[in-house]
Amino acid sequence: KAVALTLKRQPDCNVSYTDDAILRFNRADISMAVAVEGGLITPIIKDAGAKGLATISAEAKELAGKSRDGKLQPQEYQGGTFSISNLGMFGVSSFNSIINSPQGGILSVGAGQQRPIVKDGALSIATVMTITLAVDHRCIDGAAAAAFVKEFKGILEDPLQLML
């Protein structure tokens, strides 16, 4: 949901590169990386921006199960506009993903870890998560990528935005 909202606010990152044109999308069809026997597949949460968190969670669980069981239909894994890879659930704190062409970008999500931070001049402990964004610079420039990361960070730091 956070990526879909970010793409709505930063539409220059919801694009794909082709030999003929840069394609721009109005919907956020989010591909999620799922490990399967012998490789990886990226089923799609279609129009994720129009769905609530509970619906997205249920769809992600269902699609991951179908992926692992080898029961995905082509329309369930073809045509995504942006990808997410989450190795954080395996305790990996930081990693780089490879762009799922022709998509313009992929967000790598690392594990949340407790770290010391300084807030208002005082030392405290906070859960900190590392993300890495890889973009195809033929269709997404560095300024747009930086704006995406800034927007995504802001949404995660104010998660009530996901409820609106």
Predicted regions and their residues:
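C-terminal catalytic/motor cores of large multi-domain enzyme assemblies
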Residues: 1-164
